[in-house]
């Protein structure tokens, strides 16, 4: 595993620049005045990317996607305080993941202040093989045919724990 990016961010424009280095063409816009204070971390693990983004101001992100990946976008917060958080027009709820269909060709989301976003980018082929090995046929169907899904709490926790582990403990 390799830490590709690990930095504090001070503007929405910086988010766009950092994502450009990953192959995204996106625009980020800060919705409140004042300096943004946030954090951006990306870890590469084999063919998988793991991203953690947090900001203290609301930020809208719009643009392209990485075509060879399915992305699992998860907002990590008490959803009572995350009422302005959404992806592709869908409001975040507990055990919810968005934007993973390989049919999506764009990213559109809004980060609420202090609601971290965790994204796991998994190669389509790896995702299919893992789902078949784990006998998670229902999850694979949801992933490949929907814009978002609410998972069973145990399955959601496994996804979040696995992604957070990769972000926080990358091995050399």
Where are these regions (language model features)?
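Short acidic (Asp/Glu) patches
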Residues: 54-59, 76-78, 100-105
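N-terminal low-complexity or simple alpha-helical regulatory segments
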Residues: 1-71
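Residues in well-ordered beta-strands of folded domains
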Residues: 51-53, 73-75, 110, 121
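Alpha-helical bundle regulatory/interaction domains
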Residues: 2-8, 12, 16-24, 29, ...
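Short secondary-structure boundary segments
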Residues: 57-70, 74-75, 127-144
